[in-house]
């Protein structure tokens, strides 16, 4: 096996936030529409902390930051996505044992709480943000560990009131990605399951039929799709512990 050696240099101001942050994930994008990439950080996991935005000053330094919202959360994800098709990035937050949240962007990188979605008891570990019903709007697939997984369809205004259960109520799902696995023109959902449960692929647009993949006790934490052998088909990379 041959690899390519690439050296990375430490950034002189390479640390973000404080030492006591229990960060679970980051999402990057141009939050304030100034042409550079900013960072949203999900903090807390099982313990409530404030999620945070770090603004790029244009030279790769992140001296300015803001909290997302006015209360601490048990967050696993703070994903940047244009949820209401207004050409700016909003934030969708996945929480553990708390309802998930949507924060709308005013176009200048200022965020206002907009709505909750999901159930209070959901142990959300992951969110897949994709147009699952091919109507031009971003929908949400919710990965809930040891509770029911749900799909929330966007009504075109960034509202998610249509709740659709999929899979088994006991699936210990950690991560979901969308890909047209069988190339039928519909996105499918690829699930990473832990607790010695086999990973699954649910076929769209109904997300009822599924197949297994993996060894059955992989303890998968994340899945990624890419055309690894350049044959025109998405392959799956599973990250296991």
Q: Over which residues does each language-model region extend?
A:
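Hydrophobic beta-strand segments that make up the repeating blades of beta-propeller
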Residues: 39-44, 91-95, 140-143, 189-193, ...
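Beta-strand-rich domains and repeat architectures in extracellular enzymes and scaffolds
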Residues: 16-33, 39-41
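Acidic carboxylate motifs that coordinate Ca2+ or other divalent cations, activating on Asp/Glu
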Residues: 34, 38, 86, 90, ...
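Blade-edge motifs of beta-propeller repeat domains
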Residues: 2-21, 55-73, 104-122, 153-171, ...
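Solenoidal tandem-repeat scaffolds enriched in leucines and small polar residues
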Residues: 122-130, 136, 142-147, 171-178, ...
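Beta-propeller blade termini
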Residues: 24-33, 76-85, 104, 125-134, ...
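Short glycine/acidic-enriched loop and turn motifs that connect beta-strands
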Residues: 44-48, 98, 147, 195-197
């Amino acid at each position: 096996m041959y690899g390519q050696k690439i050296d990375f240099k430490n950034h002189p101001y390479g640390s973000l936030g404080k030492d006591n942050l229990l960060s679970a994930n980051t999402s990057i994008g141009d939050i304030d529409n100034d042409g550079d990439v900013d960072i949203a950080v999900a903090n807390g996991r099982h313990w409530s902390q404030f999620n945070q935005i770090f603004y790029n000053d244009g030279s790769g330094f992140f001296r300015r930051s803001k909290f997302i919202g006015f209360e601490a959360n048990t967050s696993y994800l703070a994903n940047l996505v244009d949820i209401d098709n207004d050409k700016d990035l909003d934030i969708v937050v996945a929480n553990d044992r708390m309802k998930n949240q949507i924060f709308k962007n005013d176009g200048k990188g200022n965020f206002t709480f907009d709505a909750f979605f999901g159930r209070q008891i959901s142990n959300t570990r992951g969110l897949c943000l994709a147009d699952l019903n091919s109507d031009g709007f971003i929908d949400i697939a919710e990965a809930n560990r040891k509770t029911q997984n749900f799909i929330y369809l966007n009504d075109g205004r960034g509202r998610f009131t249509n709740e659709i259960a999929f899979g088994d109520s006991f699936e210990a799902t950690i991560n979901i990605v969308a890909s047209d696995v069988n190339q039928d023109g519909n996105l499918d959902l690829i699930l990473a399951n832990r607790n010695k449960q086999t990973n699954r692929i649910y076929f769209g647009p109904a997300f009822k039929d599924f197949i297994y993949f993996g060894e059955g006790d992989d303890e998968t934490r994340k899945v990624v799709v890419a055309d690894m052998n350049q044959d025109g088909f998405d392959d799956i990379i599973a990250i296991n512990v």
